[in-house]
Regions:
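Short, charge-rich amphipathic interface segments used for partner binding and complex assembly
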Residues: 7-49
Length: 49
């Protein structure tokens, strides 16, 4: 569901921020991943079903 997908993306954002996911990434890589996830969340928010 949309709620489940949103929760999974938000968890991924937290894990990237806390270095739980991909701990060797540079700050620039983390920032880029966060921007991509923000875009994914925006698209998901616009999705109606």
């Amino acid at each position: 569901s949309k709620v489940d997908m949103t929760a999974r993306l938000l968890k991924l954002k937290r894990d990237i921020d806390n270095k739980m996911a991909w701990p060797k990434w540079s700050p620039t890589e983390r920032w880029a991943a966060q921007q991509a996830l923000n875009s994914a969340l925006d698209i998901l928010d616009e999705y109606h079903y």
